[in-house]
């Protein structure tokens, strides 16, 4: 049994392909999970889909052709050619998959290193897979350990100090383009997490925001949470507002562009459109008075951010390395601990049964029972010492040997019970 990760990110896949790979809604997520898990070699699986990445994390029986199967599943549902996806995909196995997962959770693999949005996105992907019964104890272990690793990095480094998300990078670029945002008004299209982040960063820089969303109630709720510097407008008036103001940020979950040349008419003032959605929201003709920036266009500011955080990132990567090693050490202990407990429990049961027989037959005086029980305990403890040491030193891939020991001693039931308890205790956050 092994961990495997198939990864498509801003590093290996451009935005045009990424938006085709997007599994943004529950129907698509459910469909890809069902298709991937129909392969019997794949025991557990989750899919993380954001504007900058699509990640498949799986716990599998066998590596042979499994990654190809996952890529074929993604190809089938996205319509992107298999060979193109295979060439682009980053595939990680065993400790490489865990190291990658920990790096993703800790925002070291993000477009903007140190942003904390990924933690919530990973939790959502995990909870969705769990609700769909596609995630079990092994992914529970991996995800919970990844979240703990991310927490350690946030507490021990400044990697997330003044956290920067893609939305805040867009606002930074807006400031570079027009200067002080104080007193300006920006149009924000959408009312989801990314739109909310854009609004918050704009308001932090003293701008006012007009929120436009198809669902007016969602827009109203967001505006109320932001205070007096936020207002709303009807989605039917979108064209009016994008032709009136210089700053437009769009972050909806639409399947196709909602701002096109039909809406965005030429104006006599400079406008800046920030498309922070995947798939893209904006498809207009650029000219001297209108500039459009998509997610991939934010990389220049991202590179500046990387330089500022490079030292902290190196510290964080060393923590990821240590936590990965610790994870596999704990996993090895988890493999051996249940069989050791089952053996000891079996020996204790046999000893207690024989002790009761001896008492019943009058072989022992009542005054000697406690001493006899202590003696028996010392005997089976001494007898099991060497097997215990050897079990703890078994290779981490020796699960078949452990299962055989349980079968030979007839302790499968106790072994399964202790396995379940061990995993449940380990998964407590």
Swiss-Prot record:
EC number(s) recorded for this UniProt protein: 1.2.1.70
Record-annotated site: Important for activity: 100
Residues the record marks as active site: 51 (nucleophile)
GO molecular function: glutamyl-tRNA reductase activity; NADP binding
Keyword NADP: yes
Keywords: NADP, Oxidoreductase, Porphyrin biosynthesis
Metabolic or biological pathway: Porphyrin-containing compound metabolism; protoporphyrin-IX biosynthesis; 5-aminolevulinate from L-glutamyl-tRNA(Glu): step 1/2
Catalytic reaction list: (S)-4-amino-5-oxopentanoate + tRNA(Glu) + NADP(+) = L-glutamyl-tRNA(Glu) + NADPH + H(+)
Keyword Cytoplasm attached: no
GO process terms (BP): protoporphyrinogen IX biosynthetic process from glutamate
Top-level enzyme category: oxidoreductase
Residues where NADP(+) binds: 190-195
Record-listed substrate binding positions: 50-53, 110, 115-117, 121
Subunit structure: Homodimer.
Family: Belongs to the glutamyl-tRNA reductase family.
Misc. comment: During catalysis, the active site Cys acts as a nucleophile attacking the alpha-carbonyl group of tRNA-bound glutamate with the formation of a thioester intermediate between enzyme and glutamate, and the concomitant release of tRNA(Glu). The thioester intermediate is finally reduced by direct hydride transfer from NADPH, to form the product GSA.
Comment, domains: Possesses an unusual extended V-shaped dimeric structure with each monomer consisting of three distinct domains arranged along a curved 'spinal' alpha-helix. The N-terminal catalytic domain specifically recognizes the glutamate moiety of the substrate. The second domain is the NADPH-binding domain, and the third C-terminal domain is responsible for dimerization.
Purpose: Catalyzes the NADPH-dependent reduction of glutamyl-tRNA(Glu) to glutamate 1-semialdehyde (GSA).
Name of protein: Glutamyl-tRNA reductase
Lineage: Bacteria, Pseudomonadati, Campylobacterota, Epsilonproteobacteria, Campylobacterales
């Amino acid at each position: 049994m092994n961990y495997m990760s198939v990864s498509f990110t801003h590093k290996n896949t451009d935005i045009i392909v990424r938006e085709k790979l997007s599994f943004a809604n529950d129907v698509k997520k459910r469909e890809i999970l069902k298709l991937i898990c129909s392969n019997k070699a794949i025991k557990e699986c989750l899919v993380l889909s954001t504007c900058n990445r699509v990640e498949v994390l799986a716990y599998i029986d066998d590596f042979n052709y499994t990654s190809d199967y996952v890529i074929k599943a993604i190809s089938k549902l996205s319509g992107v050619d298999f060979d193109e996806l295979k060439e682009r995909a980053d595939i990680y196995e065993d400790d490489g998959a865990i190291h990658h997962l920990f790096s993703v959770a800790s925002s070291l693999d993000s477009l903007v290193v140190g942003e904390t949005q990924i933690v919530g996105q990973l939790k959502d992907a995990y909870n969705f897979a769990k609700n769909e019964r596609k995630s079990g104890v092994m992914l529970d272990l991996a995800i919970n350990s990844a979240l703990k690793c991310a927490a350690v990095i946030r507490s021990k480094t400044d990697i997330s100090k003044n956290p920067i998300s893609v939305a805040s990078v867009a606002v930074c670029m807006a400031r570079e383009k027009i200067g002080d945002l104080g007193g300006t008004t920006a149009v924000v299209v959408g009312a989801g997490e990314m739109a909310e982040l854009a609004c918050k960063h704009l308001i932090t820089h003293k701008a006012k925001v007009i929120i436009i969303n198809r669902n007016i109630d969602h827009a109203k709720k967001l505006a109320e949470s932001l205070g007096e510097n936020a207002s709303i407008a009807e989605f039917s008036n979108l064209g009016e507002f994008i032709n009136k103001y210089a700053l437009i940020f769009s972050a909806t979950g639409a399947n196709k562009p909602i701002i096109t040349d039909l809406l965005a008419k030429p104006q006599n003032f400079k406008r800046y459109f920030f498309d922070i959605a995947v798939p893209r929201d904006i498809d207009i003709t650029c000219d001297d008075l209108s500039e459009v920036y998509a997610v991939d266009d934010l990389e220049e500011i991202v590179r500046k951010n990387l330089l500022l955080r490079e030292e902290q990132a190196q510290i964080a990567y060393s923590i990821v390395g240590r936590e990965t090693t610790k994870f596999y050490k704990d996993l090895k202990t988890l493999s051996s601990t249940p069989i050791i407990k089952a053996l000891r429990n079996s020996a204790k049961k046999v000893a207690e049964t024989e002790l009761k027989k001896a008492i019943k037959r009058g072989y022992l005086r009542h005054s000697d029972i406690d001493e006899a029980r202590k003696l028996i305990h010392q005997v089976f403890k001494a007898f099991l010492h060497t097997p215990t040491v050897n079990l703890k030193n078994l290779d981490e891939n020796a699960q078949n040997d452990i299962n055989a020991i349980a079968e030979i001693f007839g302790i499968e039931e106790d072994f399964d019970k202790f396995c379940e308890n061990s995993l449940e205790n380990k998964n407590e956050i």
